[in-house]
């Protein structure tokens, strides 16, 4: 039978797996997409009576517009199978390690499989946003106050498939 560990963390003093079929150990990427827009505007109207009998009206207004966009595929918690001491993993068919950690904290773990597939994950987290605003236009201030905000981030990382303190045997031959 096959066994699959996705987004899991297995830790034991000793690991002794015998998998008749395939063993898949896969880290999961958290994903999100952001596509936002905001618009706002306002008009204020005030009427003031002064002590000398004069009065005046004071309309004012403001406008703002902004957009934000983002995209992320990121491993926050790498899947792992870790023996504190010794271990053995025998896989009848294919061992697939996708961005996960397999190994031991101390003594070596022996891993045997007909085929070993190793795949690293490319993670990214990108985003940007801006906002433009005009405000403070009134009878006394005909030139508006302006506001411009911009922010962005662009991160990348590799989540590597990793074997720690292991001897890996593929189809009878030790591999690195």
Name what the model sees in each region.
Residues 1-176:
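Binding/recognition "hotspot" determinant
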């Amino acid at each position: 039978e096959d066994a699959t560990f996705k987004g899991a963390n297995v830790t034991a003093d000793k690991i002794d797996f015998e998998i008749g079929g395939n063993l898949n150990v896969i880290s999961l990427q958290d994903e999100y997409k952001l596509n936002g827009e905001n618009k706002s505007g306002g008009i204020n109207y005030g009427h003031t009576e002064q002590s000398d009998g004069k009065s005046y009206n004071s309309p004012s207004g403001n406008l703002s517009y902004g957009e934000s966009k983002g995209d992320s595929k990121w491993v926050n918690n790498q899947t792992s199978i870790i023996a504190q001491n010794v271990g053995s993993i025998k896989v009848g068919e294919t061992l697939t390690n996708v961005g996960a950690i397999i190994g031991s904290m101390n003594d070596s773990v022996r891993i045997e499989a007909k085929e070993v597939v190793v795949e690293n994950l490319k993670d990214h987290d990108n985003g940007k946003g801006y906002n433009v605003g005009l405000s403070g236009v009134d009878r006394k201030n005909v030139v508006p106050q302006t506001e411009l905000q911009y922010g962005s981030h662009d991160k990348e990382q590799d989540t590597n498939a990793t074997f720690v303190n292991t001897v890996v045997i593929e189809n009878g031959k030790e591999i690195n």
